[in-house]
């Protein structure tokens, strides 16, 4: 699905877990500076990605990850809308649907960098690494993952990097962790939170 927002073209696609692990890099790989790259890389909480999130992926049958936002560089992206049958228009939405659905192709030279969802990506990479534990559930590598591909029309490498670094900063600056009250209300795996919720309901 293709969409536009001021200054950006973005596309919602799906990748297999093994494809995402192989093809998508981390934001620190966008930096031209080795020092800045190392600094960004250290921001990834490896213990959280490999232990907590890896355990979640390997042990839960109802596992689910939200979309990973990815910057796409190079590769000559091309968007081609698909042809739909206008007769199949029961809901009167044909025009809107026809504009949104299509095929996004690259020439093979593209590079992907995770702007949001780096810990999710790290946990997937770790789980599919045969040298690490825990082991992935059967068939995990072929499960689908939602990816949001971000494109910019800036051809100059410097302008491209500035724009995507700004987006990376915005996405992560305004991210807000779940507060304790919301955790108590919504949590279904933390025994303490569940007991607290029951006490509050009966008091």
Predicted regions mapped to residue ranges:
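N-terminal extension/subdomain marker
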Residues: 1-80, 85-94, 101-104
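Basic- and aromatic-enriched surface patches that contact anionic nucleotides/nucleic acids
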Residues: 64, 70, 74-75, 81-203
